[in-house]
């Protein structure tokens, strides 16, 4: 019997007690929905397999003492199939012990779950166990990473790549349609600074300092070997296309008929660098994401909001709702009407759009697209955007939407890369930062994704490179993957020994270690649902670590394959073999049941790792 089945049983009993007049003043309307009646795993196994606080939840509403209400609940539970014992403890806890067959039913539930319909999209051989449809019918637009196209993706963006894709997988496993989206900031001042930095690198490489070109990186520009690389690539591409950058540079130096400068010395050549370099960075970012196993459905270009008139249209929409006014020569969004701490400029007095104007248009576009319009727009932003939440939520409300429902903003905190207790600055291309490609080259995709997804994104996080590269139990990803590989090895040894679980009697899974593994397996569906509802994919990783620990402990105390057939230390010594066979080897029926349990663990670990975008290895 699963925890969910127990919750449904408890809910049914609550309604029956109301009907029978055994629940005091409690009415059907006062009974919480089933998902609010979750059972818990007691810390002390002497208190049973599961515990419920239903009596304490409802006692005040019933006008009864918790223990007095718990007694009829316990009596009804004790009559249910699959329950061996029920006790009322403490102030009103109800402790439930399942019979061995009922507890072991989860094994069949895991292995009988059908294959996923989109198997080609999954890393591992996953099935439907744990998956549900409680978010079905919703289209969620999940925007993440969205790093500026002015350099390689740094470690902060890498964290969002791992967390965002894991979150998308978790949401999809709960029935939602998820649109993974990358917002490509190819409009605005950061692009100008990028182009200026490239021109400076090009000018220095071509000795154009004497011609009036700045050869030093602007103080607000971008540095790193990648700038020199891209500048050289732009020059080579331009020359291949018959464009003479030096000639453009001289053209920039031209004067008008009055002998006055036509403009900044690098206007034309800077535009040439911009239009060529931004697509180069776009291609590089796309490749980094693909190599990191993150496949976006939409690559949205900020520039298109202006080119397609969407910024003007969104502002007109807000104006029609009475939320736009003019002051001091500028156009303002009256965001204070909707909870913001101050009103926001959207068109500056010089006629230029403020950055927030694009944000307004972008949200409106997400919600009203011809295809895949978002019921919920989820933004995953860095810690430096915390002050942006108020104006974004105000804008959501101004459009008639519900902040927190139609728009959700998740803030991620900083990541530090450490080795031997010291911060690491290992990028040769990007200067004083760590990039996604740097991290992957050192620890691999699996370790990078798992380590970044296993921690709460709302907390600062240190990555220990030495730990992630190690093959020890202290390395979380190794520990979980090894559990899967170990279970595969059990299968191979069982096959060699002629052991099969066909027709296995799962009621024989009656030891304490068996029970711990069974309970862990039973919790996966609720963990997956909670991870989706809370937007916290790290809960899947932490669950996998607990399951792996439980499995490793079980493996060490409960044999599946006879030791004499697999352990080198028993070979060639008949007496030793006999002694070990008597002491360690299970009878065939129990071995079959344990093999089936082994394979259920294997399946759940494969399912869970797949949700994190991490492989489940056959061998290690």
Swiss-Prot record:
GO terms for biological process: arginyl-tRNA aminoacylation. A motif ('HIGH' region) lies at residues 147-157. CDD domains: ArgRS_core. InterPro entries: aa-tRNA-synth_I_CS (IPR001412), Arg-tRNA-ligase (IPR001278), Arg-tRNA-synth_N (IPR005148), Arg-tRNA-synth_N_sf (IPR036695), ArgRS_core (IPR035684), DALR_anticod-bd (IPR008909), Rossmann-like_a/b/a_fold (IPR014729), tRNAsynth_Ia_anticodon-bd (IPR009080). GO terms for molecular function: arginine-tRNA ligase activity; ATP binding. It comes from the Bacteria. It catalyses: tRNA(Arg) + L-arginine + ATP = L-arginyl-tRNA(Arg) + AMP + diphosphate. It is found in: Cytoplasm. SUPFAM superfamilies: Anticodon-binding domain of a subclass of class I aminoacyl-tRNA synthetases (SSF47323), Arginyl-tRNA synthetase (ArgRS), N-terminal 'additional' domain (SSF55190), Nucleotidylyl transferase (SSF52374). Its main location: cytoplasm. GO terms for cellular component: cytoplasm. PROSITE patterns: AA_TRNA_LIGASE_I. Keywords: Aminoacyl-tRNA synthetase, ATP-binding, Cytoplasm, Ligase, Nucleotide-binding, Protein biosynthesis. Its EC number is 6.1.1.19. NCBIfam families: argS (TIGR00456). Belongs to the class-I aminoacyl-tRNA synthetase family. HAMAP family: Arg_tRNA_synth. Monomer. This is Arginine--tRNA ligase. It comes from Bifidobacterium longum (strain NCC 2705).
């Amino acid at each position: 019997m699963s925890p969910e089945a127990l919750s449904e049983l408890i809910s049914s009993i609550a309604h029956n007690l109301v009907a029978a007049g055994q629940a005091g003043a409690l009415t059907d309307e006062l009974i919480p929905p089933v998902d609010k009646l979750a059972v818990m795993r007691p810390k002390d196994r002497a208190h049973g397999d599961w515990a419920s606080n239903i009596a304490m939840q409802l006692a005040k509403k019933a006008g009864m003492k918790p223990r007095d209400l718990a007694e009829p609940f316990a009596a009804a539970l004790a009559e249910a199939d699959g329950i061996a014992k029920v006790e009322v403890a403490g102030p009103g806890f109800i402790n439930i012990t399942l019979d061995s067959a009922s507890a072991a039913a989860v094994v069949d539930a895991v292995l009988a779950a059908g294959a996923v319909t989109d198997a080609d999209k999954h890393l591992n051989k996953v099935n439907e166990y744990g998956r549900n449809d409680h978010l079905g019918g919703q289209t969620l637009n999940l925007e993440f990473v969205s790093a500026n196209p002015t350099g390689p993706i740094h470690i902060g963006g890498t964290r969002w790549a791992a967390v965002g894709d894991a979150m998308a997988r978790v949401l999809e496993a709960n029935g939602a349609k998820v649109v993974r989206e990358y917002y490509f900031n190819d409009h605005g001042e950061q692009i100008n600074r990028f182009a200026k930095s490239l021109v400076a690198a090009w000018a220095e490489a071509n000795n154009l300092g004497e011609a009036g070109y700045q050869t030093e990186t602007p103080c607000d520009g971008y540095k790193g070997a990648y700038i020199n690389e891209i500048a050289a690539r732009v020059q080579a591409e331009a020359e291949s296309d018959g464009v003479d950058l030096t000639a453009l540079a001289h053209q920039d130096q031209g004067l008008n008929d009055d002998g006055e400068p036509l403009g900044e010395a690098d206007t034309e050549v800077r535009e040439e660098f911009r239009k060529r370099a931004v697509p180069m960075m776009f291609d590089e970012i796309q490749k980094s994401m693909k190599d990191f196993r993150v496949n976006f459905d939409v690559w949205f270009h900020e520039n298109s909001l202006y080119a397609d008139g969407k910024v003007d249209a969104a502002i007109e929409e807000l104006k029609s709702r009475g939320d736009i006014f003019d002051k001091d020569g500028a156009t303002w969004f009256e965001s204070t009407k909707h909870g913001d701490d101050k009103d926001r400029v959207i068109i500056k007095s010089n006629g230029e759009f403020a950055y927030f104007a694009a944000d307004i248009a972008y949200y409106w576009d997400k919600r009203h697209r011809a295809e895949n319009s978002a019921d919920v727009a989820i933004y995953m932003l860095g810690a430096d955007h915390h002050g942006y939440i108020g104006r974004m939520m105000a804008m959501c409300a101004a459009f008639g939407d519900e902040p927190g429902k139609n728009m959700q903003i998740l803030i991620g905190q900083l990541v530090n890369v450490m080795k031997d207790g010291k911060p690491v600055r290992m990028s040769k291309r990007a200067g004083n930062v760590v990039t996604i490609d740097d991290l992957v080259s050192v620890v691999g995709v699996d370790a990078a994704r798992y380590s970044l997804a296993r921690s709460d994104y709302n907390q600062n996080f240190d990555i220990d490179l030495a730990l992630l590269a190690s093959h020890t139990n202290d390395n979380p990803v190794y520990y979980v993957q090894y559990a899967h590989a170990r279970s595969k090895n059990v299968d191979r040894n069982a096959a060699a020994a002629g052991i099969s679980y066909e027709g296995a009697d799962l009621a024989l899974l009656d030891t304490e270690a068996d029970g711990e593994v069974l309970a862990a397996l039973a919790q996966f569906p609720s963990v997956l649902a909670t991870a989706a509802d809370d937007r916290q994919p790290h809960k899947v990783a932490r669950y996998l670590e607990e399951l792996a620990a439980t499995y490793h402990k079980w493996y060490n105390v409960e044999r599946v394959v006879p030791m004499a057939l697999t352990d080198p230390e028993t070979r060639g010594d008949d007496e030793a073999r006999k002694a070990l066979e008597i002491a360690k080897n299970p009878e065939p029926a129990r071995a079959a049941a344990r093999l089936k349990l082994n394979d259920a663990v294997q399946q759940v670990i494969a399912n869970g790792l797949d949700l994190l975008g991490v492989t489940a290895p056959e061998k290690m």
